[in-house]
């Protein structure tokens, strides 16, 4: 972690096979009392748990845009509208996907009715499932992720995020150069 001038504030050493999002809490606990207003991180840290932690502590997380991981030719999750009142998703064919269960990772699963989807004109763009059931997931802390998206679109946040390359990325680049890790 570094400050806005590129000075290293703190660091943690973690195994290379651990994902950034899993090691974040250890570093954050060391930095929690320095009075951060913003926490500018890369896409590896864009998780509901980190968003909740930062927002609950009054820190604005500045996450980058992350491209949806949807197959070409299929509807993206954003094309399914979440209906908060009914706690259901509405598909592009104007049918409901109702809440089914919450999995161990904290994702609520919303499933369509296979009999309805079987006759739908959008089936080939929606799912390849043999039983014609579309499943859309929503994390229990998805509201925090939506707040982070609102922050990302706030005036000045794009410029603030662009300073990462001048601060923390420069530190990593210098370290790689000095220790012979460029090839």
Predicted features by range, described:
Residues 1-183:
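Anion-binding and metal-coordination hotspots
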């Amino acid at each position: 972690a570094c400050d806005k001038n590129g000075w290293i504030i703190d660091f943690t050493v973690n195994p290379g096979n651990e994902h950034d999002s899993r090691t974040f809490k250890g570093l954050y606990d060391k930095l929690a009392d320095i009075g951060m207003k913003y926490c500018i991180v890369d896409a590896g840290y864009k998780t509901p748990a980190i968003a909740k932690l930062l927002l609950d502590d009054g820190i604005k997380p500045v996450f980058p845009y992350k491209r949806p991981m949807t197959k070409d030719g299929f509807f993206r999750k954003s094309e399914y509208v979440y209906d908060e009142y009914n706690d259901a998703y509405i598909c592009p064919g104007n049918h409901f996907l109702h809440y089914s269960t919450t999995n161990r990772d904290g994702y609520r699963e919303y499933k369509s009715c296979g009999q309805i989807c079987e006759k739908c004109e959008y089936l080939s763009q929606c799912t390849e499932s043999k039983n014609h059931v579309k499943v859309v997931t929503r994390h229990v802390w998805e509201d925090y992720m939506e707040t982070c998206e609102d922050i990302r679109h706030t005036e000045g946040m794009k410029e603030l995020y662009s300073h990462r390359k001048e601060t923390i990325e420069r530190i990593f680049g210098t370290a790689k150069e000095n220790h012979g890790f460029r090839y």
